[in-house]
């Protein structure tokens, strides 16, 4: 069982490493999104560089990476405690942030982390998504909405009594904020781009 779990965790890392924004940009738009906008491989920069259609596809793909990776023990009928689903999900987040297929320079893990939560705790995902969308509607800042959504997920998880989930969501929230430190500086300086489509 231990070997199988290790192998699934490695597979989850590989799944997380799929740079959907990079590949879609190169294949369909002949653009390397790392050379434009924020230079980030995530969904937000895909929206900024490639447009709403491509950005939406990248967002869905990045969410699915987290969801599929989290459910790997279920798909392979591995008889383990369901908390181990969070382990494979965590490896997908690591893969997205430090992708094997893109020089270990990845995204900020917001969508992939959301996919992990969607697979493990769907109601928590919905609650955090609502907070994200409301914040986005009011502020027009994707970065700020992502951070507030992550913090909301952490606060809500505290009432769920699942300490393994709480620890993972706390790590996700801290990591998301850390990855957005440049965005925080730009927001404070009034230099952070706002979305125009919402």
From Swiss-Prot:
It catalyses: an acyl phosphate + sn-glycerol 3-phosphate = a 1-acyl-sn-glycero-3-phosphate + phosphate. Its main location: membrane. It is an enzyme of class 2 (transferase). The chain crosses the membrane at residues 5-25, 56-76, 84-104, 114-134, 158-178. One of its GO terms (cellular component) is plasma membrane. It comes from the Bacteria. It is a multi-pass membrane protein. Pathway: Lipid metabolism; phospholipid metabolism. It is found in: Cell membrane. Its EC number is 2.3.1.275. GO terms for biological process: phospholipid biosynthetic process. Signal peptide: none annotated. SMART domains: G3P_acyltransf. This is Glycerol-3-phosphate acyltransferase. It comes from Listeria monocytogenes serotype 4a (strain HCC23). The gene is plsY.
């Amino acid at each position: 069982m231990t070997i199988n779990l290790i192998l699934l965790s490695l597979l989850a890392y590989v799944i997380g490493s799929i740079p959907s924004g990079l590949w879609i940009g190169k294949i369909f738009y002949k653009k390397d999104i790392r050379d434009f906008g924020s230079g980030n491989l995530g969904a937000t920069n895909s929206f900024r560089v490639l447009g709403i259609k491509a950005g939406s596809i990248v967002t869905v793909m990045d969410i699915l990476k987290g969801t599929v990776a989290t459910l790997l023990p279920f798909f392979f009928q591995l008889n383990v405690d369901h908390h181990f689903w969070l382990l494979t999900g965590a490896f997908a987040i690591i893969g997205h942030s430090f992708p094997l297929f893109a020089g270990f320079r990845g995204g900020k893990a917001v969508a992939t982390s959301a996919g992990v939560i969607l697979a493990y705790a769907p109601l928590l995902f919905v609650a955090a998504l609502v907070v994200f969308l409301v914040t986005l509607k009011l502020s027009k800042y994707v970065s700020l909405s992502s951070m507030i959504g992550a913090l909301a997920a952490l606060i809500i998880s505290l009432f769920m009594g699942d300490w393994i989930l709480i620890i993972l969501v706390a790590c996700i929230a801290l990591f998301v904020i850390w990855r957005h430190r440049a965005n925080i500086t730009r927001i404070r300086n009034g230099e952070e781009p706002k979305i125009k489509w919402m």
